[in-house]
């Protein structure tokens, strides 16, 4: 490989690293809302998986404790799935056009 080619690869790697850092910061600051019970329970979570807010519909206050616990858990799980999907989508859009070896996934 020629020196110019190696320098180009190094520059490309540095640019990719900068893009990855920016993407990770954007994801960390993003907020998603997970829901369950047809919207009766909603959980707002950051990309860092920090729960910022839980909203319960007033009609749930008469429900059995176990039902409420299940709905909250389902809403949290929904939020986590949305964060993971957003991360996969951003990574895929960022790496589109890159020729990665088969089976190689980012972030490493």
From Swiss-Prot:
Role this protein plays: Binds to DNA and alters its conformation. May be involved in regulation of gene expression, nucleoid organization and DNA protection.
Q: How does it assemble?
A: Homodimer.
> What name does this protein carry?
Nucleoid-associated protein PSPTO_3645
- Answer yes or no on keyword DNA-binding: yes
Q: Provide the primary localization.
A: cytoplasm
Family, similarity comment: Belongs to the YbaB/EbfC family.
Keyword DNA-binding present in the record's keywords: the answer is yes
Region Disordered, annotated ranges? 85-108
Per UniProt, what is one GO molecular function of this protein?
DNA binding
Q: Which Gene3D superfamilies match?
A: Nucleoid-associated protein YbaB-like domain (3.30.1310.10)
One of the record's GO cellular component terms? bacterial nucleoid
List the lineage, top down.
Answer: Bacteria, Pseudomonadati, Pseudomonadota, Gammaproteobacteria, Pseudomonadales
Q: Where in the cell is it found?
A: Cytoplasm, Nucleoid
Pfam families associated with the record = YbaB_DNA_bd
Q: Where is the composition biased (Polar residues)?
A: 85-96
Record keywords? Cytoplasm, DNA-binding
């Amino acid at each position: 490989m020629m020196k110019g080619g190696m320098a180009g690869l190094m520059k490309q790697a540095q640019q990719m690293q900068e893009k990855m850092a920016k993407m990770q910061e954007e994801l960390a600051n993003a907020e998603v809302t997970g829901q369950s019970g047809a919207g009766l329970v909603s959980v707002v979570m950051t990309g860092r998986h920090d729960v910022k807010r839980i909203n319960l519909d007033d009609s749930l206050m008469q429900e059995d404790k176990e039902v409420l616990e299940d709905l909250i858990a389902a809403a949290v799980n929904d939020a986590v799935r949305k964060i993971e999907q957003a991360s996969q989508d951003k990574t895929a859009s960022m790496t589109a056009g890159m020729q990665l070896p088969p089976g190689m996934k980012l972030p490493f």
